[in-house]
């Protein structure tokens, strides 16, 4: 169904114009716009081989193997994760983007080092020295003592859905106290 697929590709392209330009770098927004313009042009000229232009697959373990802290729309499981190894034993995996995020937020090298040392010992950022209260949610993860509210997962899926022609496969973590109504 060539016409139907072209409508889908155009819909993805048109969704770029709905992105809040204050939340994304001009370079990234321009690249996204150009990529979808090219997708429309090439799809119209050559057709589309697959029935979907884009999907989001569950890639948590694969992401770890690729040395990524997180991939897709999945938040990090925790700032420090302990992975059971197939041959026995465990391996601690620390989120490598925390120092960069702290630096971007304006923390000094000494403050970053102190916060990272705290995370290494406590396995949490809550209570870390120098950490400003308004920055705590920046480091929220899918599980643990600073977890993202389940509606945050839903909102993230809603934000990317206009660019996904297939499915989003994602875990939405909810607390044990969640009810059917939740």
Residue ranges and their predicted role:
Residues 1-34, 40-182:
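Catalytic alpha/beta core of large soluble enzyme barrels
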